[in-house]
A protein has these predicted regions:
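Short glycine-/small-residue motifs
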Residues: 137-138
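Short N-terminal helix-loop-first-beta-strand/juxtamembrane motif that initiates sensory/input modules
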Residues: 60-81, 174
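Bacterial N-terminal signal peptides
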Residues: 26-40
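Boundary at the C-terminal end of the N-terminal hydrophobic targeting segment
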Residues: 43-47
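N-terminal secretory signal peptides that target proteins for export/translocation
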Residues: 1-25
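Juxtadomain coupling helices with adjacent low-complexity linkers
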Residues: 49-56, 143-179
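A short beta-strand signature within small-molecule sensing/ligand-binding domains used
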Residues: 120-127
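Extracytoplasmic/periplasmic sensor domains and loops in membrane signaling proteins
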Residues: 90-116, 155-159
Length: 179
C-alpha cells in the first residue's frame, strides 16, 4: 500500500519538476511521512497483539489459517481464581465473558465431542487440551459446512483442536498476556 501510494504521488509530482527544487523536497517529505505511517501502523499492531492473552492470540492465528471454512472459534474455561467457566477467547469479541452453558460443560465433563448442524453451518464442540493432553476447557468451532459435509467438519474440527493443543503449555498460560 505504501509503495503504491509513493509511486502515485511521484507520478503526480514528476511533471512539476520544472517548478524547481521544492518539488523534490515535497516528494521526499511525502515519502518520509508515508514510510513513518506504515512503520507506526506495524508497531501499533505489534503492541496490540502483545496485550492479548495467549488464548486470544491462538484463536486469531488458527481462525486466519482456516478461513473461509472456519467461521467461528471460541475457547471456554475457568480463568485462574474463578469458579465459572466462560468464553475467554473468541473470533466474536461480543461473546467473550459469557458463561458456558450446561451443554458446554457436559462436553468437558464427559469428553464426548458434539456436532451440531445448523442450516448452512456446522458447530463442533470438544474438550480443549494442553500439550500434555490434560483437559483445560472447551473448544467450539463453527464451519461453513452444510448437511452431507459432516465428515469434513469432524476432520477439520479435530485438526483445529490438535493445532491448539500443541501450542498450549498449560491452562494458566492461556490467560497470560505477551508473546
Amino acid at each position: 500500500m505504501g509503495i503504491f501510494f509513493l509511486q502515485l504521488v511521484r507520478s503526480a509530482i514528476v511533471p512539476l519538476r520544472s517548478e524547481g527544487k521544492w518539488v523534490t523536497r515535497a516528494f521526499l517529505t511525502i515519502a518520509v511521512l508515508a514510510l513513518a505511517q506504515v512503520l507506526a501502523g506495524s508497531l501499533w499492531a505489534q503492541e496490540q497483539d502483545s496485550k492479548k492473552i495467549l488464548g486470544q492470540r491462538l484463536v486469531d492465528e488458527i481462525a486466519a489459517k482456516h478461513k473461509p471454512d472456519l467461521i467461528y472459534l471460541g475457547l471456554h474455561s475457568q480463568a485462574p481464581k474463578s469458579k465459572k467457566s466462560v468464553i475467554f477467547a473468541s473470533t466474536d469479541s461480543g461473546k467473550i465473558g459469557k458463561n458456558s452453558s450446561c451443554a458446554d460443560l457436559h462436553v468437558v465433563e464427559k469428553g464426548i465431542p458434539v456436532m451440531e448442524m445448523k442450516g448452512k453451518s456446522t458447530t463442533v464442540l470438544e474438550r480443549l487440551l494442553d500439550s500434555s493432553g490434560h483437559t483445560v476447557g472447551l473448544i467450539v468451532v463453527g464451519f461453513n459446512y452444510t448437511d452431507g459435509q459432516e465428515a469434513e467438519a469432524a476432520k477439520l474440527g479435530k485438526q483445529v483442536s490438535e493445532e491448539l493443543a500443541q501450542q498450549i503449555p498449560s491452562k494458566n498460560k492461556l490467560f497470560e498476556t505477551g508473546k
